[in-house]
Amino acid sequence: MREAEILLWIYVWFYIDWGINYYRESFFTRAGISPAKYDEQRFKDFLYSYTDSLNRYCCDIDTVSAEQVQEEIKLSYKKVSDVYGLTTPRSFQHPKILLFNSLYSGCGVLGFMGPFFSESHINMQITPLEYPFTYAHELSHLLGISSEAEANLWAYQTCLLSSDAEIKYSGYFGLFPYVLMNARGLLNEEDYKNWISSVRPEVINQYKEKREHWSSLYSPLLGEIQSAMYEFYLKGNRISSGQKNYAEVIGLLLSLPDEGIKKLAEN
């Protein structure tokens, strides 16, 4: 009975401290919009507008100042309208160092938000190019966002709102895997080849280097265990699509009105 009582209090602690965010209104309700039905031309318009910006901001990022990135991203979050229901980032909120970093790398985890103490964590082996987008993603969870798709949307938007060109590029690059996934699934073979050929070779090379970096650290056994547990966790907390929710950020972007897409994709 004692063990059951402890588990019950852990359960209560989780939902009181942060887990209650899984029961808040959806992004669509807070934004006052409806989920968009797939429209091929609208998707292509977004795709090529996004790609133009991705190519324009493409650059090499060899080092990154964590403090500068955190300051810039927090400034961007302070520009977000109150209607979306995010809390205001505080100066004392900084990502914590992982004690067993290699285990998280082995699972392919770049960062996470610890719900019990409301702390964000960033993998110390993350590449400089990925740091701004990942930090912005994890900070959104700390500010009350439970959906992974919406966390990606805010990571994308807040990076684009930065005055720093490298942070902007991290935003575009961070969205690239989800754009790529959607393009592969929605476009016919000819259209897909035409689109992917429009992406700068430097971007493709950086994407390959990123994948190789994490593949070299990945443990199939740890990855499979973590993936199964995380899938169970997400589906048990009203994220019915599980880990596929990450890629649903594109659907959120396409559901925004035209001026919203322009602001998010062409800033």
Sequence positions of predicted segments:
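Transmembrane alpha-helices and immediately adjacent membrane-cytoplasm interface residues
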Residues: 1-28
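Alpha-helical transmembrane signal-anchor/signal-peptide segments
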Residues: 20-44
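Second-shell loop/turn segments in exported
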Residues: 37, 62-66, 121-125, 138-143, ...
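Short extracytoplasmic
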Residues: 40-63
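Auxiliary, metal-adjacent structural segments of Zn-dependent hydrolase domains
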Residues: 58-118, 124, 128
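Active-site recognition of the HExxH zinc-binding catalytic motif
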Residues: 133-152, 156-157
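Short helix/loop segments within enzyme catalytic domains
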Residues: 156-188
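Pan-zinc metallopeptidase signature
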Residues: 203-267
